[in-house]
Amino acid sequence: MEALNSMRDNAPRLGTSATAESITSKHTPHAFSNSHDSRVGDERIVVLGGVPLRGEVEVSGSKNSSLPILAASLLASKGQCILHNVPHIADVGTMCEMLQALGASVQREGHTVIIDAENLQSHSAPTELVRKMRASFYVAAPLLARLHRAEVPLPGGCVLGPRPVNYHIDAFQKMGAVTTVERGAMNAVAEHWHGASIYLEPKNSSVGATVNIMMAACLATGTTTIENAAREPEVVNLAEYLKKMGGKIRGAGTATITIQGVKELHGTEHTIYNDRIEAGTYLTAAGITGGDVTVHGLPPVHLSVYIDKLQEAGIEITHGDRWIRAATVQPLRATDVATAPFPGFATDLQAPFLTMMCLAEGRSAIEENVFDVRFNYAAELLRMGADITLTENTAIVRGVSKLSGAEVQATDLRAGAALVLAGLGAEGRTEVTKVEYIDRGYEHFVDKLRSLDGQVVRQTKSGNKK
């Protein structure tokens, strides 16, 4: 308790006496390395609940924008790619290690990453890196487009059920690649790399397939059209980057994207969008704890459907051009949601929202339509006193008057964050293990929660503070 109170009292206030930049000012230029690796499995987040979160927080750069944009830097055959607002998270570290393993030079200064891929050499992605995260498969398209050959193991990352890369491979085949999948890896050769008309299944509008096809098509002969393309802001951010590199792309942000191939792409300078999922997480934390939180750096249009659902749940929302405030002024109301591709309810915010519904009055139905397995964390919430029943792809949540602290285990990135939020809204002490999942996508998660008065500390297994 003393350690938690001490950390809370000394925490910086984002938006008042400190900013996100001041937290990371200790970083100096260096070749990129993944500093989280040595800590994997050795730490936990300890939470004392019952304190409403209040204050302001700066949203970091987007994980889901950073990863494809970093991979797309391999397409530049001359000049440096300078990327700003890149978050300090484990998945970015893994992707930068991947680029280095393939022959690119990668340097970092604060939130800026500089990539020089002129001497791209290897067409073979290291298995140990690809299996760390699904987004590693994004390097397949740049390798095929530049080297006309790619050997990429099938990806890993969070366990969210089967997420095959068949859409990606089918598109590569239509563009002229000869592919095989053997011993857990895709091998592809593309002697004649050309544009194609590609139709994606409308149910999912795969973001991963959309961005891989966009990258692949930039250096293909002729025109490529993607029907039922993903419309996420992260797709738009990538398209903006590719166009700065010399690519010819129309329609990003709509269901039909057209790419006219060019002979080469060059380095450029670009800024990563801020993270809408991180913003939604902190807004939800206000509801779970009965608090009042303002997030800065995100246009509300990136969260419009989620904002509507927060309001339906009884949270008061106000916003400006690049800020959103969530204030809890009345008891939470049960609210039904169904996840869907953008502009629908984001699957990455399903776990935080379900956690909030555990404390709402009434019965909620949370329907998961994007991933087959994304309720594994529900068993952990049951340990805290939640009332949840799972039926196929739907969780029925009956609100309870309180949650109780317990030792729980993160099952994936977003579930890990949601369990920390559950601890903040619970009575007593909660310990969250497997926090390496959270490191994959949230920059300075504990520091930011502490800046909002959250009683949170990160510890090693021996109890030492980090």
Task: Say what each PLM segment does.
Residues E2-K466:
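Short, structured segments at the rim of ligand-binding sites
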